[in-house]
């Protein structure tokens, strides 16, 4: 019947593909895959031929042995099939060691680290067979070793295996395998030997072949060739003529693991730790992952992808490794292609962003440039951005700073609402209310860099107001950033805005107490004046100069030449601003030493005069800018030599500029009054520097190194009477920063706040009417919502009123004599 004549190989659940590679003993190896799932496998095939009964019996022995032997260093059996014509053995996907070495020749060959771990695995497999299984492999050579995709060596070739003490039952080897026989097999006088002697001789042959290629004849073992020096003494023991001196496999491992031994290196140590990682203590895992990133550069790429990466993912998924897995994770991610990255790394990254661990959040923000290109827009807007924005309101300044800088990378992938609404609200609050000067400066910097991605309506509403506010910031680099912001985004302003809004603001900056800020203001003013003169001389060029004003999406290269004031990658600006934290009277640390990462506390007032501000950027992208002066371009960069002192000045009340909102109409007289007041305050030379962001020492600059024209640092003026803090001055930490304030007060703004809290002011910060940065809706409420609620304000007013009534009653009781209506008795 046809049923009985059907070929059983048709039901074989694996497809055999690829070319057949011949192996000793009649075997061949081919690549294959499972028919249902497509999982890759290796298929060993043996064709049964008449007249080769001994070889066929050895092949069947190998098929039986591989099914029963389970060990990490022995070839893993998956499936098999035996017919009258052929034998099939399906294993994990592997490559013969000889083929693997040839493939690696073009890339520099197999490194000693790989060889050390590979031999370590083969010796462990022999130790298992001899000491635990009481079995003799009897075929250890290069053709019996296979390499998996992670670069790990597996022992195969079980054709000639036999039980220890039953040597007579072993199948006879082929002629091509006789060169691996130990000398005692032919010399009957050397009958005294250990059970492992033959396998250890073959191990010596394997070592010779790994370093020197296929063994031509047994006498070639006397020549060391390229064998590693640290392995030579142990190799000589293996190929010694006396079988009694050949060590046990476990003893051989111990000898090579001793200090200075061939198996004593970071690669072997890493692998041994990974094998036992499930039973390691959390502290040991923490230390291991911290040191792993440094060693990855010397490890094979395949090993990192297929061995270490799964362990990192498992450690994050089920362990408590935390943020320490991120550096090695992203380092290995560079070895993956786009599909592998999307499949393995991105799901973990998305999950990490929802973590409440601050260390993990800041590490993610710092490493974002490594994986941002693999994130698609729906993932960024739906799963990442909602978690990232929480960093804008974090109490840790380092997280706020990193969150701001990460927007440089996220902005191109944000949708309309997240970019033009949510992000701008957070930027408005940070620039107006954050107590860290570097963070306010970084916010201005970032806004200028992402300006091309904003829609035209948002740009017209936000940019002028934001940069105008920055020019009145007490932190000098913030003022410089505001001036440079105007220069970098000059093509987004109409000629009417340039003349009516931008130039009046820049003219006010020409009286800035810092020379570098003034110089940049003059250069930027000349740039805008050149544009206006061009239009005045040739009105037909107006359309060309305003072509980007209403462009929906400008190219990011528009602001790419902003004199390096910010860079595409994420780095820290704060570390440039903050060098020392003590005052002049304190013993300051050495210049350039990074501040320790600690929580920032409000420092007490001191009498240190305000140091000079860092240089401002020297170029603008405008084609109308005149040539820079040679003196500015030739000066040396003094940023690292500046002693920035404490970032909180002695006189907060005088140096703090009025907190006007970004929705201010620059044509109104009240704004001009504010500008005059700000200029007059600055002209006295009183500045406020905010507390240093000590945690920013984690980074190394946000591209400001070449940003500003550098000039020699100004000499510190001697402390004069005008620079001493007035009596009764309080530090910034004593003020209620969340309370609404007034704009038109002179003197100590905060100490008189309670007396005027019930009065309505013209300042938009306290206005109840809806507004925004440019005069539209929803922006005023952003900052107003950050303060006290109406119920709390009303309650405070009642309490203050009650205190006033009680004080008057106490005064009347203390008065002498009777009081008449409308008359106050004088003492």
UniProtKB/Swiss-Prot annotation:
Residues 16-309 form the Protein kinase domain. Residues 639-650, 774-783 have a biased composition (Acidic residues). Residues 788-817 form a coiled coil. It comes from the Eukaryota. Keywords: Coiled coil, Repeat. Residues 580-827 are annotated as: Disordered. InterPro entries: ARM-like, ARM-type_fold, CIK-Related_Protein, Kinase-like_dom_sf, Prot_kinase_dom. Residues 666-677, 742-756 have a biased composition (Polar residues). Regulates COPI-mediated retrograde protein traffic at the interface between the Golgi apparatus and the endoplasmic reticulum. Involved in the maintenance of the Golgi apparatus morphology. Belongs to the protein kinase superfamily. This is N-terminal kinase-like protein. It comes from Xenopus laevis (African clawed frog).
């Amino acid at each position: 019947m046809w049923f009985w004549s059907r070929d059983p190989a048709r039901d074989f659940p694996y497809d055999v593909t690829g070319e057949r590679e011949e192996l000793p003993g009649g075997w061949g190896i081919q690549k294959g895959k499972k028919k249902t799932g497509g999982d890759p496998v290796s298929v060993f095939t043996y064709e049964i031929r008449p007249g080769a009964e001994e070889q066929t019996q050895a092949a069947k022995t190998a098929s039986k042995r591989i099914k029963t032997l389970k060990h990490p260093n022995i070839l893993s059996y998956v499936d098999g099939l035996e017919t009258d014509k052929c034998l099939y053995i399906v294993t994990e996907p592997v490559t013969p060691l000889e083929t693997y070495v040839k493939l690696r020749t073009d890339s520099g060959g197999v490194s000693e680290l790989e060889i050390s771990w590979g031999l370590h695995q083969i010796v462990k497999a022999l130790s298992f067979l001899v000491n635990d299984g009481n079995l003799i492999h009897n075929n250890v050579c290069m053709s019996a070793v296979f390499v998996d995709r992670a670069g790990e060596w597996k022992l195969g070739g079980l054709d000639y295996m036999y039980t220890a003490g039953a040597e007579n039952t072993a199948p006879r080897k082929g002629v091509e395998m006789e060169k691996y026989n130990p000398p005692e097999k032919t010399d009957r006088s050397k009958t005294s030997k250990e059970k492992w002697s033959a396998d250890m001789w073959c191990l010596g042959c394997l070592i010779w072949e790994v370093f020197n290629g296929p063994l031509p004849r047994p006498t070639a073992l006397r020549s060391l060739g390229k064998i590693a020096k640290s392995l030579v003494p142990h190799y000589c023991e293996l190929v010694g003529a006396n079988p009694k001196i050949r060590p046990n496999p476990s003893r051989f491992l111990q000898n090579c693991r001793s200090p200075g031994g061939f198996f004593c290196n970071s690669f072997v140590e890493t692998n041994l730790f990974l094998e036992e990682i499930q039973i390691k203590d959390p502290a040991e895992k923490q230390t291991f992952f911290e040191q792993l990133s440094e060693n990855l550069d010397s490890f094979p790429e395949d090993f990192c992808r297929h061995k270490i990466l799964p362990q990192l993912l498992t450690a994050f998924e089920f362990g408590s490794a935390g943020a320490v897995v991120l550096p090695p994770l992203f380092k290995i991610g560079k070895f993956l292609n786009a599909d592998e990255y999307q499949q393995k790394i991105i799901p973990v990254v998305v999950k990490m962003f929802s973590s409440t661990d601050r260390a993990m959040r800041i590490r993610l923000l710092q490493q974002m440039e490594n994986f941002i290109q693999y994130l698609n827009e729906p993932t960024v807007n739906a799963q990442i951005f909602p978690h990232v924005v929480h960093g804008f309101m974090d109490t840790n300044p380092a997280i706020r700073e990193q969150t701001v800088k990460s927007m440089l990378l996220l902005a191109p992938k944000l949708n309309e609402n997240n970019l033009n609404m949510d992000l701008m609200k957070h930027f408005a609050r940070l620039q107006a209310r954050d107590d860290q000067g570097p963070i306010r400066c970084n916010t201005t910097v970032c806004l200028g860099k992402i300006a091309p991605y904003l829609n035209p309506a948002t740009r017209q509403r936000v940019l002028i107001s934001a940069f105008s506010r920055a020019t009145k910031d007490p932190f000098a680099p913030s003022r410089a950033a505001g001036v440079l912001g105007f220069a970098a985004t000059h093509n987004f302003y109409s000629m009417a805005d340039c003349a009516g809004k931008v130039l009046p603001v820049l003219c006010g900056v020409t009286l800035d107490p810092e020379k570098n800020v003034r110089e940049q203001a003059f250069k930027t003013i000349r740039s805008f004046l050149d544009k206006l003169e061009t239009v005045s001389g040739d009105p037909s060029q107006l359309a060309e100069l305003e072509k980007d004003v209403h462009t929906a999406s400008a190219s990011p290269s528009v602001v790419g030449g902003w004199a390096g004031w910010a860079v595409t990658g994420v780095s820290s600006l704060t570390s440039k601003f903050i060098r020392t934290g003590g005052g002049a009277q304190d013993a300051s640390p050495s210049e350039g030493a990074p501040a320790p990462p600690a929580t920032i506390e409000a420092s007490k007032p001191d009498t240190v005069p305000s140091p000079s501000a860092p240089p401002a950027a020297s170029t603008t992208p405008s084609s109308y800018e005149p040539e820079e002066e040679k003196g500015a371009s030739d000066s040396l960069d003094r940023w690292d030599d500046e002693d920035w002192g404490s970032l909180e000045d002695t006189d907060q009340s005088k140096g703090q500029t009025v907190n006007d909102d970004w929705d201010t109409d620059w044509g109104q007289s009240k704004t001009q009054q504010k500008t005059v007041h700000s200029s007059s305050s600055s002209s006295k030379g009183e500045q406020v520097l905010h507390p240093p962001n000590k945690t920013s020492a984690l980074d190394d600059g946000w591209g400001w190194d070449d940003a500003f024209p550098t000039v020699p640092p100004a000499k510190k003026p001697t402390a004069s009477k005008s620079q001493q803090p007035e009596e009764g001055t309080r530090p910034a930490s004593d003020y209620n920063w969340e309370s609404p304030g007034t704009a038109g007060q002179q003197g100590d703004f905060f100490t008189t706040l309670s007396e005027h809290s019930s009065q309505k002011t013209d300042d938009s910060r306290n206005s109840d009417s809806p507004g925004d940065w440019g005069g539209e809706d929803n922006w005023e409420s952003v900052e107003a919502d950050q303060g006290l609620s109406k119920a709390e304000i009303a309650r405070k007013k009642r309490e203050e009123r009650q205190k006033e009534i009680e004080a008057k009653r106490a005064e009347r009781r203390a008065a002498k004599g009777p009081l008449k209506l409308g008359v106050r008795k004088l003492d």
